[in-house]
Structures are given as C-alpha cells and as structure tokens.
C-alpha cells in the first residue's frame, strides 16, 4: 500500500494544493493513509489527505497534541479510548461495526477540534488558508473551518475503510497503551523493588482503613469547616433520575451518550453533585476554578468554585453503566514538613459515582488527580471479591454505604492540607458529630462545568491552550515523589493528569478508566 509522497516533491499545480503543500512544508512531511497516492485518486481526495497530514504535522510541531485518547495506527482520523478498545475483540455485525467506527471517529473529531483551536496563531492561519482554498467538492462547502476539516477527515476515513482487510486491521490496532514505562521498571529492578513498594502500600492501606474507622466526632480538624454545596436544584425526582439512567443503560450505541438528551445528562450531574465539608485551615484549602496564570502555569481562582465533570462508562454485569465524575481543584498541597515529597502546585479530589440500571448509586470511588490514593466506597448492592493472593494492589475498600435511592446525594469530608477524603456521609447536611459550640462552618456554593473546558483554556493573549501537555501531564505540578516512585513505571508520579492517563496502582497495573474495573473487584451482593 503506497503512502502519500512528501508534498515538497510532488503536488498538483492548483491553488488548493499549493496552500496545503505550504502548510505541510512548514511543519514537515507526514505519512499518508492507506487509500492510495495523489496520482490515482480524485483531486478532492488528494487535497483532503494532504490537509489532514498538514494539520497533524502542525499539531505535532506546536506540541498541542491532545493526549486523552490514542491514535489508531494506520488510520489517522480514528482515535480510541479504553472503553471502545474493550469491544475490539468482540464479534460485530456490519451495523455494530459501523457504530463502533463512528464512535472512534467521534473521539478523533473532538480531539482534532481541540488541537486545531489550540494551535499558535501562525500555524492556525496556515491551516485556515489551506482549508479555505479547498474546492467545493472536498465537502462541507460554505461551512466553517472546523466543519470542512471534519468533512475531509470523513473522506480520508472512507478511503482507508475501502482498503481490503481494513476492518481486521482496525480491530487489531484499536488499542490504548498503558501508562507504565516498562523500561523504567526494568532499570529500577521492579521485580525486586516492587516488594518494597508493596509493603509500603500495605501500611498506607492499613492506616487509611483505621482513619475511616474513627468515630466522626474524633476526626482530626485543623481549622473551620467550609461546607461547599452544589448551586443546582437539591431535590431531584427519583422517578425522573431512574428514567434517565435506564435510557442510558438501555442504549446500545457507541457511546450511549449519543442518544441521551444533554439536558438529561445535566440533570444527572445536578442530582448526584456531592456536598463537600472541607477542613479549611489555610488558603491552600480554598478550592476554586482552574485557569492559566500570567506565567502560563495552572492556578486556582478561589473567588468562584467550579467543579469539573465528565460522563464516563463502565461495563458491569452485562450492561454499560453511566459514571458521573466530579473533580474539585485546590491551589496546592502545602508541605506537612520540610522536604515533603507529596507537596506541590495544584491539588484536587476526583469523585466518581457509578449508577446501577435503575439510576441508583452502585459504587463510589475516588482518586487524586495524579491517579494516586484510589479508594472504593461500594453500596450494599455490591460485595467485594476475595483478594487475589498477590503482592499487586487490590481494591482498597474504605467504607460501605447502605442502599441509596436514585438521586441520593452524599457529603464528602475532606482533610486540610492533604485534601484526602476522610468520610462519606449520606445526605447533604454537616452531621451533628462534626458540629459543636466551638465549631464554625462557612457555607458557599459551586457550579459545574465539563472538564473538556480544561483542554481549551484562555491563555491571556487571545488564544487557548490545554491545561494538559502532549504527555497528558499538567506542567508545573510535578512532585518530589517522582524521584521515589520512578521504578514503578509511572511517569512523574504525583503530577496532575488528563482523563484517560490515570495509572492508579504502584504495584501491578491499573487505570482509573478501565471498562471492567468494577467487575474486576466486585460482585452483586446476595439479596437478604
């Protein structure tokens, strides 16, 4: 299968191709797709192949590649996440395969749009010039630049799919590399040092369980309670919540959200938005809205609190269940002592609600935005599977909640400084055990916004930039602990990460977005 020659050596003498060739030459040549060469394709196809190559080259040169999904090797207009990759080995009829391809294309469309928006002005202008020089038959004539780029991407995909064997190739190539560096593990003698890390993890797990076992009234407190409540309506209709969730679970589209009313999804997020009770002892305990400062680094504005949200999915018990992910951001984790390896700029708490078929909570879990400190809080609907006889990390179950109704909210008790989760309490009110004559509580509200907004943040100069680099990390949030944990294979342990890049086990391999994660550790509890 021939690739597209470098445009510096051959190109039709047309206005469109000249503009496209200029864009490619500036950024460098790119490998072409599977579907043929400029000499044996219609001009519109050739122009689109070159446009996509030019855009990819400009994105790479500018360092604005979105790292939340993986490219499907050999198919430049498809991307894949762990959920969609989990279907690749399963039988698919033509309709199912078409839906799956459409979902892969949707991931690329989303990421490509972010990358195009985040290009530096000069690079973006080169692509815009090339787009506007496209002939009408390239697709989406008269539409905006994004729409014309997408039309070309669809045309390139059609060429790739027409190649014999493309279906089998796509299914074998639709994989997501894990976020563990095997070379680092080899250099760090992980087969030996892993036992030391495992011993440390067991100590952490024991201490964490002991902390959760403390009576509420005895929880350590360094400051005053800051109760942070969602600004959205607080009395969701359980029947409506159940209907919305059931509609999502019952859909077999890739992804199911494609058939969901966005307003209904917003209602789900509003219904399950938690209340936070934060032990506030310093400015570091004041959450807020993430923005890019004048120095280009991530900062938090405490004047207005925005919790970022994401709709995710897990495959459990024969169903695809919706997951509501909320992230609360703090300006920093201050050092508890000189040289604290866990301290650093930007901090947070990620809270995930997995809904059952009827829309009621099935299990909660939480991580730090770096992927560390993964904890599970199942409801009584689930029972933990017996732990495997291995040194690898299992599910750290810190608390079990009673059965909860659809729309039930919870209150999260958050520690000062570390911002660790200390307790999960059904309801929205600060419990009596945490109150008293010497206890004051400030009450404020927060709004929610999709976490995709963090991939396109105003940069202060009229453009936008992703909070996350092409490696999926937030620059400037590195922690000294990375020099301790590098032999585990996790790159820059402690640094904040983009969704899809959260490795959550130092010993073993585990990712927060694994589609069978809940099934790996839990089974349905026996009914009484």
Features from the language model and the residues they span:
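Bacterial signal peptide processing site
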Residues: 30-32
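Domain-length functional cores that host ligand/cofactor binding and catalytic or interaction surfaces
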Residues: 34-243, 345-347, 358-528
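Acidic, contiguous segments within the catalytic cores of piggyBac-derived transposases
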Residues: 13
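N-terminal secretory signal peptides that target proteins for export/translocation
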Residues: 1-10
């Amino acid at each position: 299968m021939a690739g597209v020659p470098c445009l510096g050596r051959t190109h039709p003498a047309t206005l469109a191709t000249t503009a496209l060739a200029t864009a490619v030459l500036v950024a460098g040549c790119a490998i072409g797709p599977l579907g043929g060469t400029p000499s044996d394709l219609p001009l519109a196809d050739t122009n689109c192949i070159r446009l996509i190559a030019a855009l990819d080259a400009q994105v790479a040169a500018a360092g604005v590649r979105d790292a939340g999904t993986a490219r499907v090797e050999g198919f430049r207009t498809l991307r894949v996440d762990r959920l969609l990759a989990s279907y690749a080995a399963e039988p698919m009829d033509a309709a199912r395969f078409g839906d799956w391809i459409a979902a892969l294309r949707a991931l690329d469309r989303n990421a490509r749009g972010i990358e195009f928006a985040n290009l530096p002005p000069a690079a973006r202008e080169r692509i815009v010039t090339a787009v506007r020089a496209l002939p009408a038959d390239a697709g989406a004539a008269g539409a905006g630049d994004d729409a014309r780029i997408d039309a070309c991407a669809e045309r390139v995909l059609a060429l790739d799919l027409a190649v014999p064997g493309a279906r089998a190739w796509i299914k074998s190539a639709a994989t997501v590399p894990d976020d563990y560096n095997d070379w680092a593990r080899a250099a760090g003698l992980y087969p030996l040092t892993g036992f030391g890390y495992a011993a440390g993890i067991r100590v952490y797990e024991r201490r964490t369980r002991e902390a959760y076992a403390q009576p509420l009234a005895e929880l350590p407190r360094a400051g005053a309670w800051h109760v942070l409540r969602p600004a959205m309506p607080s009395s969701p209709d359980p029947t409506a919540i159940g209907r919305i969730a059931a509609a999502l679970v019952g859909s077999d589209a890739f992804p199911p959200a494609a058939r969901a009313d966005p307003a209904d999804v917003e209602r789900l997020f509003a219904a399950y938005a938690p209340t936070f009770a934060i032990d506030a002892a310093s400015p570091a305990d004041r959450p807020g809205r993430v923005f890019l400062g004048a120095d280009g680094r991530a900062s938090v504005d405490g004047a207005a609190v925005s919790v970022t949200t994401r709709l995710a999915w897990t495959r459990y018990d024969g169903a695809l269940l919706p997951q509501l992910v909320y992230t609360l951001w703090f300006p920093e984790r201050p050092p508890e002592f000189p040289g604290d390896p866990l301290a650093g700029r930007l901090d947070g708490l990620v809270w995930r609600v997995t809904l059952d078929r009827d829309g009621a909570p099935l299990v909660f879990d939480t991580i730090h935005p770096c992927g560390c400190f993964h904890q599970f809080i199942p409801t009584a609907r689930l029972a933990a599977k017996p732990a495997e006889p291995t040194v690898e990390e299992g599910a750290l179950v810190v608390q079990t909640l009673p059965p909860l109704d659809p729309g039930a909210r919870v209150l999260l008790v958050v520690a000062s400084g570390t911002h660790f989760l200390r307790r999960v309490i059904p309801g929205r009110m600060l419990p009596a055990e945490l109150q008293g004559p010497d206890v004051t509580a400030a009450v404020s509200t927060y709004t929610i916004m999709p976490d995709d907004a963090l991939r396109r943040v105003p940069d202060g100069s009229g453009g936008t930039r992703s909070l996350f680099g092409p490696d999926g990390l937030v620059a400037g949030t590195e922690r000294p602990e990375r020099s301790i944990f590098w032999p585990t294979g996790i790159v820059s342990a402690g640094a904040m990460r983009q969704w899809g890049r959260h490795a959550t086990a130092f010993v073993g391999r585990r990712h927060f977005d694994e589609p069978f994660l809940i099934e790996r550790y839990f089974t349905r509890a026996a009914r009484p």
